[in-house]
Regions:
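FAD-binding core/adjacent interface of flavoenzyme oxidoreductases
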Residues: 1-7, 65-154, 231-238, 249, ...
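Rossmann-like nucleotide/phosphate-binding core characteristic of flavoprotein oxidoreductases
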Residues: 1-3, 80, 316-419
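FAD-site-proximal beta/loop scaffold in flavoenzymes
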Residues: 112, 134-144, 247-298
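A conserved FAD-binding loop/helix module that cradles the flavin
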Residues: 291-335
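Predominantly flavin-linked oxidoreductase catalytic cores and closely associated redox partners
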Residues: 102-103, 109-206, 211-220, 287, ...
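Short amphipathic alpha-helical segments
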Residues: 17-19, 42-43, 123-126, 168-170, ...
Length: 419
């Protein structure tokens, strides 16, 4: 019986393991399917990581290296090249590796840190032929940054998520011509700083409310047809533009990788596509926790690490205490303008001082206010100058406020009309 097994050795798994060790656990095992720790950070060679966590700008591999160095100062065990096949409700982990073959591990506590994966062309149903030269932005990033291959010379990017924006800059720096970035929504899905640094600084046009309606080519992509879309995201006839390209990169969203979570019977949130979690990142199964992009997709790895610190500390407390909480829980409900909240459930009796609520808005907002209500009563209000779907918002709800609630809490957004 292992005290704590962590599934995934990316930024979430590394932070959770170190936090659990710092909080008194000594029997910790990380299972990582890749041949090295660090996860997606290893291919993110651009800077911008670590400002919140370490107080300086780091590249992805540097950030991962800092986390791995911290882990080396502990006695946490790591098994690389180990694929987890199943997690059961009674906390048994079925995994396989070349060195040890098929194993069934029993754990007192589990933290799920599997991260997320990219949506593919098949997931969004782009019409046209199926030639070579169509990649997800993350796959292209790995080819360019880790394998040393330039995937194309004339590039069109569909989607304005952060990976797509960063790859627009990377492909330009590597000598390719990025003709445009095309986004089906009327707003960008990425951080404002990435739009400025990756598109505007390199004079790459961004077409909002546009999408690809046709791809032409035999052995290789030759042309892509882009059209404007209406408010229902349907192409508008007569607005087509043709681009002569040999490569199309897709940055059309990320999906939390939750096959193991569903297999374990853990309740899921249809909005985040991740597990429903309590204020301490515990899932619906006592002793099983989840953190990072497997719960909801983050903008910054620093926030992943912070969330994982909490999960690691909570798992340590669960194992050392030896019992699950039986405190009453309140539901957090996304109201007007809010896409989701994490956590989805809060136990006021178990909150120390306050609980941090993360959420995303459904559209761009100017001056606005975030309200927290219970049964029509307003319990809290927070002001913001601007909010966008591509940037996660955070509010802190104090314990004293939570104790006033006698039912579900609704988090909503209202735009402030200037008088």
């Amino acid at each position: 019986m292992i005290d704590l097994v962590i599934v995934g050795g990316g930024p979430a798994g590394l932070a959770a393991a170190y936090s659990a060790w710092q909080h008194g656990l000594r029997d910790i095992l990380i299972l990582e399917r890749d041949n090295e720790l660090g996860g997606i950070l290893n291919q993110c060679i651009h800077n911008g990581f670590g400002l919140h966590r370490f107080g300086e700008q780091l590249t992805g591999p540097e950030y991962a290296g800092r986390c791995i160095e911290l882990l080396r100062s502990t006695g946490v065990r790591v098994e690389l090249g180990t694929m987890v096949l199943e997690v059961t409700p009674d906390k048994k982990i079925h995994c396989v590796s070349r060195e040890k073959g098929y194993q069934i591990l029993e754990a007192r506590s589990i933290i799920l840190c599997m991260g997320c994966r990219e949506r593919t062309r098949g997931a969004i149903g782009i019409p046209g032929s199926r030639p070579a030269g169509i990649y997800t932005a993350g796959a292209a990033q790995r080819y360019v940054n880790m394998e040393g291959y330039l995937v194309g010379k004339r590039v069109l990017i569909l989607g304005s998520g952060d990976i797509g924006l960063i790859m627009a800059r990377r492909m330009t720096l590597e000598g390719a011509k990025v003709l445009a970035c095309v986004e089906v929504m009327p707003y960008s899905g990425g951080l404002t700083r990435n739009i400025v640094q990756c598109l505007q600084d390199f004079d790459i046009p961004l077409y909002l409310s546009h999408t690809i309606v046709d791809i032409q080519g035999k052995a290789r992509v030759e042309k892509a047809t882009v059209a404007k879309v209406d408010e229902n995201r349907r192409p508008i006839p007569g607005t087509e533009m043709e681009f002569d390209v040999d490569t199309i990169l897709l940055s059309v969203g990320l999906i939390p990788e939750n096959e193991l979570t569903r297999q374990a019977g853990i309740p899921m949130d249809p909005h985040t596509k991740g597990a429903v979690v309590y204020e301490n990142m515990e899932t619906g199964i006592p002793g099983v926790f989840a953190c990072g992009n497997v719960v909801h997709v983050h903008d910054l790895v620093d926030f992943v690490s912070g969330e994982s610190d909490l999960a690691g500390a909570s798992a340590a407390a669960y194992v050392l205490k030896g019992e699950a909480s039986d405190a009453a829980a309140l539901d957090l409900i996304p109201g007007n303008g809010v896409g989701y909240t994490v956590p989805q459930r809060v136990r006021p009796a178990d909150v120390d001082r306050s609980v941090n609520i993360s959420f995303r808005v459904r559209q761009n907002y100017g001056p606005s206010q975030i309200t927290v209500t219970c049964g029509g009563r307003q319990l809290a209000r927070f002001k913001r100058q601007r909010m966008a779907p591509g940037e996660m918002e955070h509010i802190a709800l104090p314990k004293v406020l939570l104790e006033k609630a006698d039912g579900p809490l609704t988090v909503a957004v209202e735009e402030v009309i200037a008088e």
